[in-house]
């Protein structure tokens, strides 16, 4: 049997039965669990973008931007009329263009606490032909549902396992620490590790800018038994270091690292880091994506698009 590449290993959700109401059972072969069907890794016709957002609540990015700039988040939700992530035709146009650019699969990094609409992802995949992987998880402490603070890590893990068994979920992510990692975020990371053990779903993370807590995230996950080869530590392109010391430390342990905000002004400063990692022998550990999240990034609006 053909040996899978590291990228295919990360993409494969190997632990769940496809049916929504059937109990979880091991899959006999590696699969990619998309929102519509399970597919074999070798059938993906193009690159996989491991961290995009195709469905978010209208108020998510205004809240995110306010918190990132140290301001109070908006008091009321943004009206949904005309919101681009609720425009099926517009998003299908974008996904069709992304397919033509050579992308063969997209992993959506949203989940309920970010306003992800799973039904929309299914309709988007069906209309555009783009295989889409949906995720489960809890983003970062400023966005956690209130109950997460009081729940035990076992309760959080059980909830993630429930989501993965009842819905077509193919990954756990994006799981984040907002700035310095908090005790509650540590609890969520431990729960994610336990959910991974029960589901085999790969994990991808959000690190606070510029890449804070990257090593700590992998430490927590590995301590509860998550193999580093099943983890992608995200937003490492924001950690600008020509010596790529943190990047190499993560790769040496077997983890993937994400350069996942591509398509903007910061790309040029990341090229030397990518070249340094390739020269160090870590090309197979590198994952790329755009973290699509705003209308300005769409091709129709003059942006680079997901591809």
Where are these regions (language model features)?
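Short acidic/histidine-rich active-site segments
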Residues: 206, 260-261, 283-303
């Amino acid at each position: 049997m053909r040996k899978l590449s590291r990228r295919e290993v990360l993409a494969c959700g190997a632990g769940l039965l496809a049916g929504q109401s059937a109990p979880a059972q091991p899959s006999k072969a590696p699969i990619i669990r998309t929102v519509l069907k399970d597919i074999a890794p070798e059938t993906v016709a193009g690159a996989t973008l491991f961290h995009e957002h195709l469905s978010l609540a209208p108020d998510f990015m205004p809240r995110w931007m306010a918190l990132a700039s140290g301001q109070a988040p908006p008091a009321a939700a943004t009206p949904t009329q005309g919101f681009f992530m609720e425009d099926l035709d517009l998003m299908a146009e974008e996904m069709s263009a992304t397919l033509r650019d050579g992308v063969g699969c997209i992993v959506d990094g949203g989940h309920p606490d970010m306003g992800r609409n799973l039904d929309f992802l299914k309709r988007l995949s069906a209309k555009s032909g783009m295989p889409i992987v949906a995720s489960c998880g809890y983003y970062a402490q400023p966005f956690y549902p209130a109950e997460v603070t009081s729940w035990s890590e076992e309760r959080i893990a059980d909830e993630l396992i429930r989501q993965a068994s009842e819905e077509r979920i193919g990954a756990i992510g994006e799981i984040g620490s907002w700035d310095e990692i908090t005790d509650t975020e540590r609890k969520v990371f431990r729960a994610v590790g336990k959910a991974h053990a029960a589901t085999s779903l790969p994990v991808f993370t959000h690190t606070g800018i510029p890449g804070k807590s990257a090593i700590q995230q992998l430490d927590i996950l590995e301590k509860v038994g998550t193999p580093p080869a099943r983890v992608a530590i995200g937003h490492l392109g924001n950690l600008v270091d020509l010596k790529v010391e943190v990047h190499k430390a993560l790769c040496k342990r077997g983890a993937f690292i994400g350069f996942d905000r591509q398509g903007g002004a910061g790309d040029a400063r990341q090229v030397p880091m990518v070249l340094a990692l390739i020269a160090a022998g870590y090309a197979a550990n590198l994952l790329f994506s755009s973290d699509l999240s705003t209308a300005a990034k769409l091709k129709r609006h003059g942006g680079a698009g997901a591809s």
